[in-house]
Amino acid sequence: MEQFSDLIKNRRSMRKFTDQELTQEEVVALLKAALMAPSSKRSNCWQFIVVDDKDMLEKLSHCKEMGAAFLADAAMAVVVMADPLASDVWIEDASIASIMIQLQAEDLGLGSCWIQVRGCPRVNTCIRCLIFRCSCRWFPL
């Protein structure tokens, strides 16, 4: 258990990133960690979109007025979405999945930072772009 204690003590939000791309193995590890997250009644109401397209990361960095600009410099983002009709605790379920991604990132030696955009007016436009854009990578797990 000492390793886990070290992991949670050492994890910090990072807002400065290198342009080094993640390997497919690293991305798969992050997504597997998210899929292992507990959810209410095992509803698994979340969905994950991996974004590594620089233009899309730039657009996403403007999805809220303040606090997301650093996303433009990241090599990749995982967009965590949840269906409010699938679970009455969808916010909590998505939050738990998000922290699982962050803990896995820390374990892999990767920096991460949570950006909360729920309720931001520009989010719907960004999400529509994500869903219909071909530049997102999907990994079968």
Tell where the protein language model's regions lie, with residue ranges.
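Specificity-determining recognition surfaces
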Residues: 1-27, 138-141
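Residues that form generic nucleotide/phosphate-binding pockets
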Residues: 7, 63, 126
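Short, cationic motifs built from Arg/Lys/His that form the positively charged side of catalytic pockets
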Residues: 11-15, 57, 101
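Glycine/small-residue-rich phosphate/adenosyl-binding loop
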Residues: 25-32, 36-97
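Small-aliphatic-rich amphipathic alpha-helix that forms the alpha element of a beta-alpha
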Residues: 34-35, 78, 86-127
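Residue-level "edge-of-site" marker
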Residues: 47, 118, 140
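A glycine-rich helix N-cap at a beta->alpha junction
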Residues: 69-73, 77, 127-141
